[in-house]
């Protein structure tokens, strides 16, 4: 296994944290599918299809974080973790913290966009 290393604005979580983000992504996707199924089977009004947005957002955030090896919350808080869960360390360099915040906001915007597009697709499905 390669050595895990904090890289400002690029990598702030290790293998365990990445696995945790994958679990969050899968959980969000499962909840989105359950929500979509419930909305469709209950013969709800079309506007109820927007209910999948939040679980899709959770899935998108988890998935993008796992792919980028970067935790949005840690980036905003100026922290990182490559050890056990809860062994969070502070980023001391202000330039690195700024780079982390920019990456965190980028991940948030990407996640919002992905969840919105997927929700729109579901909304306009002719079923």
Task: Give the predicted meaning of each segment.
Residues 2-127:
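Membrane-interfacial helix-loop segments of redox and metal-homeostasis proteins
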